[in-house]
């Protein structure tokens, strides 16, 4: 049997990541899983989860996406074997070498929880109730902020509420849709994602690349996680792999203020789908005609609804810009702070993949001798576990560790799973990072910014050194 396996392996071709990356479309779709290359083109129309998530994975190392997006079954491993065509000889991004029993144990116990409780991990009354209420809140606050009154200060208050409504829309409906965590219907995910373009004027397609392919697979990895930034000169230092400048000593003061422009920055940046065709180190897959149409329509609807219609209603241009900036700053602060208190805080782990290139200008990534799932725990912090308000207003991201280990499970179930996670962490001696309140979580973020900007013993680490 061993000889047969070796013979089969010799017959299979060896591919570089660059070769695999060219097969990234619906009619020619390859992926990498656990060092093996698969041509799953014939599986695309048959995939129960639809084609979009496969297209997102196309031409990439999808190992950890493949594992974390099928938490309730192991059938996908046997199914994919028939599409195996070769092995990978090089990697575009960090490779997580080790697979421990931690994640398999955690998945087994979570599966058992849903089986014994007869619950569907993607469906609950709360999911749809939240969705309806948030859409209603979004529409009502939009009307109030744009058309209900010409009183300046009242419009300012409504603009704040509209910013909050947009934040909740992003953290609940859009976020659930990008992770396929709401219903089992791919068309539902597509429609809900399109409403992000239409109502927020921001690209759902771009977000899925930044968040699902980038942040979730390479959490807190400098030069791979888009959320950390990648420029040599950055407005803040948050990893030990960055050069520190004199102004960073004040980053704990100015950085939280600048978080307010996060939403505006994202809306401007998402055009890179068509120009740079990458978000930092994360390549964009070729965009389809329908996704292009959604992108363009979303920008048009945004301009009409946020500028043209309010001007027709008789808002002055100066007042309109004021109301717009208020809602955008609220949205930016809300979202940015929600993300920062989970990953950019004290005691969490940061890593890097080096910007070293071979003769063909291909990056040579770091190999992480750790388990991907364990690193999700080491790079993430939870807070206010028992607070219903914190769970709602954060979109369940106060329980971020569970979300990273089980991104496809509806956020309503996170509180049920946390005790299981803590139990498994204790068994495997993995530290579970937790703060009792949101206040303590944000304090930890500010303290971390201060430390990184002011520590007199700070020495920049080489990007190929990962502790």
UniProtKB/Swiss-Prot annotation:
A motif (Histidine box-3) lies at residues 400-404. A motif (Histidine box-2) lies at residues 211-216. One of its GO terms (cellular component) is plasma membrane. Heme binds at residues 47, 70. It is found in: Membrane. Disruption phenotype: Mutants show no significant alteration in fatty acid composition or in phenotype. It is a multi-pass membrane protein. Gene3D superfamilies: Cytochrome b5-like heme/steroid binding domain. This is Acyl-lipid (8-3)-desaturase B. It comes from Dictyostelium discoideum (Social amoeba).
């Amino acid at each position: 049997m061993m000889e047969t396996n070796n013979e089969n392996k010799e017959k299979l071709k060896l591919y570089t990541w660059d070769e695999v990356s060219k097969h990234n479309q619906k009619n020619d779709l390859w992926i990498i899983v656990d060092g093996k290359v698969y041509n799953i083109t014939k599986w695309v129309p048959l995939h129960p989860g639809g084609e979009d998530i496969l297209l997102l994975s196309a031409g990439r190392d999808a190992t950890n996406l493949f594992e974390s997006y099928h938490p309730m079954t192991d059938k996908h491993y046997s199914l994919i074997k028939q599409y195996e065509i070769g092995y990978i000889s090089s990697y575009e991004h960090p490779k997580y070498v080790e697979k421990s029993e931690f994640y398999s144990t955690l998945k087994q116990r979570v599966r058992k929880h849903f089986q014994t409780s007869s619950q569907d991990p993607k469906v609950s009354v709360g999911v749809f109730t939240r969705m309806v209420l948030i859409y209603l809140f979004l529409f009502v606050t939009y009307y109030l902020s744009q058309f209900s009154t010409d009183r300046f200060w009242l419009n300012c208050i409504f603009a704040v509420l509209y910013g909050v409504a947009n934040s909740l829309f992003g953290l609940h409906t859009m976020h659930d849709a990008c992770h396929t965590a709401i219903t089992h219907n791919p068309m539902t995910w597509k429609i809900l994602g399109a409403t992000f373009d239409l109502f927020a004027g921001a690209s759902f397609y771009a977000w899925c690349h930044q968040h699902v392919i980038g942040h979730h697979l390479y959490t807190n990895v400098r030069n791979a996680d888009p959320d950390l930034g990648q420029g040599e000169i950055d407005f803040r230092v948050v990893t030990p792999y960055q050069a520190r400048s004199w102004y960073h000593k004040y980053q704990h003061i100015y950085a939280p203020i600048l978080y307010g422009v996060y939403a505006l920055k994202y809306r401007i940046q998402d055009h890179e789908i068509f120009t740079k065709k990458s978000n930092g180190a994360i390549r964009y897959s070729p965009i389809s005609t329908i996704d292009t149409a959604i992108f363009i329509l979303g920008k048009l609807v945004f301009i009409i609804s946020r500028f043209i219609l309010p001007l027709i209603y008789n808002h002055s241009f100066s007042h309109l810009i004021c109301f717009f900036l208020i809602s955008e700053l609220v949205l930016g602060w809300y979202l940015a702070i929600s993300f920062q208190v989970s990953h950019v805080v004290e005691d969490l782990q940061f890593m890097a993949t080096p910007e070293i290139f071979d003769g063909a200008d291909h990056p040579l990534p770091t190999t992480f001798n750790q388990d991907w799932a364990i690193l999700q725990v080491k790079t993430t912090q939870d807070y206010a576990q028992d607070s219903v308000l914190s769970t709602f207003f954060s979109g369940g991201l106060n329980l971020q560790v569970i979300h990273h280990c089980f991104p496809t499970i509806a956020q309503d179930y996170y509180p049920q799973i946390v005790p299981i996670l803590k139990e498994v962490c204790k068994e495997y001696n993995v530290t579970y990072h937790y703060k009792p309140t949101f206040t303590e979580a944000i304090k930890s973020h500010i303290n971390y910014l201060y430390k990184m900007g002011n520590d007199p013993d700070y020495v920049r680490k080489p990007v190929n050194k990962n502790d």
